[in-house]
Amino acid sequence: MIRIALVGVESMHAARFAELIASLEGKQRARIVGIWDTNSQNAEKFVAQYAPDAKIADSLGDLAECVDAAIITDRFGSRHFEQARPFLECGMPVFVDKPLTASPGDAAALVQLARERNACVLSGSGCKFAGDTLALKQIAKKMICADELHSGHLHYAADLKSPYD
């Protein structure tokens, strides 16, 4: 079983990852065993709702000592490099939810550290797997096959005043 750390649990992205991982538990593939957040109340609330068997770590270093992989879902991209660092230094794989970092310098440093430690680091968005997106994709495929759709654009609401980077 892969023991996973979840770092930064304020967003719904963390909840979705927790639900996905829990759905694999019957097969004993992976489990969230540790949580860390900048706000201990966020961590406690998250554990109660999504990961009741997980322990809340006092530090990222402590958490890195008891897991096999990490998922970083903190809302602030400017924190991602420092949050991923302890896990990468241990040579373990890390998934960083978008954005990878908030600056090109941090992104380069994160990739360099992963190379030096022979660790896997990856980042991306799970939006393409969201139910609404998948449903829209199926509708578009049918319309393309019926020669009713030749191109399109997908627009979404974005908060230009969001405090998150």
Q: Which role fits each region the language model picked out?
A:
Residues 1-51, 144:
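N-terminal Rossmann-like dinucleotide-binding module
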Residues 6, 72, 95-97, 121-124:
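Short catalytic-loop micro-motif centered on adjacent basic/acidic residues
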Residues 13-15, 80, 93, 125:
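Histidine-centered active-site/metal-ligand motif
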Residues 19-23, 85, 89, 112, ...:
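Short, well-ordered alpha-helices that flank and scaffold nucleotide-derived cofactor binding pockets
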Residues 30-32, 67, 149:
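Core-facing hydrophobic residues within beta-strands of well-ordered domains
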Residues 35, 70, 152:
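Receiver (REC) domain switch-region micro-motif
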Residues 50-111:
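Beta-loop-alpha module in the N-terminal Rossmann-like domain of NAD(P)-dependent dehydrogenases
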Residues 101-163:
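A contiguous active-site-proximal alpha/beta segment in oxidoreductase catalytic domains
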